[in-house]
Amino acid sequence: MAKRANWSLDGQQSSGGGAASWICACTDKISIAKALTRSLSVMLSRPTALLRTGARWRVSLTASGRSTVRCASTVAGWQGGLSWPQGKQPTPYEVLGLVKTGVDARQLKKRYHELAKLYHPDTAGAAQQGLGEHERLRRFKLVNEAYALLSDASRRRMYDMYATGWAHGPAPMAPAMAHGAYHERYAYYNAGTWEDMQDLNSDRQQVQFSAWGMVVWALCMLAGFQVMAFLIRLEERTSKSAHTHEEAEHALLLAHLNYGLDQDRVSRVRRFLWFRSWGLYRTKAELDEAARTNEALVRQLEGGK
């Protein structure tokens, strides 16, 4: 039999002879046709499932001439198909269905084009007809914002470090907290020896102890102020009691010595006259008469002033 043209596995024409080569080539073509027919029938029968899962069918041939059909729903750097994340606050990586550690510019751009065509209000596919216009527009905006953030290297770096630049996720940390978290991560991942790790742990304990020291210091100051206020009030009360006692003793002494008379000139004259009358007279009538006479003398003395 004359030499026939044979087809290799990659689709290029190669020379071969013999009926066996020709039969193998025909068998390969029939296998390829059957595989393509099966894959097309599956894709046409379940378009919604394929769009939801993002499955991609590929026909490949083995070295022995057998054809196989594989469904690859995931590739390196992808979380899954075109399904939308279930969380209420998805990250830009979750919106685009990408893994944080395995994203390159080519995959990012390809994924963005797929999702943009899927959720664009004017070109939404049959799989997205169940979504309202507002929901499709919201998802389309999230896809655009996620692509704008991840395609910019500086914005993406800031988001990975401090979770800034993305308004649809959890609230970012304050600058002071973010700086502290970055410093702790840097110190942890750059600790080369056990001594560095020990120093890192001791620094954390020192910060914790210093915080407790501030609390104890504040409590001691408050207790000191309370003790000082108590001592001041106690001293005032003791001084007032002592002063009252001294005044009472002085009044009692004056009462014993002067019989209720004061220390001025007129009081001293009245006291002198009273003691003199007490020594001269014995009867009540005589004492009363002497008292009236003494009082007249005292009044004359006061009038003479």
UniProtKB/Swiss-Prot annotation:
Gene3D superfamilies: DnaJ domain. GO terms for cellular component: mitochondrial membrane. SUPFAM superfamilies: Chaperone J-domain. Keywords: Chaperone, Membrane, Mitochondrion, Transmembrane, Transmembrane helix. Belongs to the DnaJ family. Probable chaperone. This is J domain-containing protein 1. It comes from Eremothecium gossypii (strain ATCC 10895 / CBS 109.51 / FGSC 9923 / NRRL Y-1056). The lineage of its organism: Eukaryota, Fungi, Dikarya, Ascomycota, Saccharomycotina. The gene is JID1.
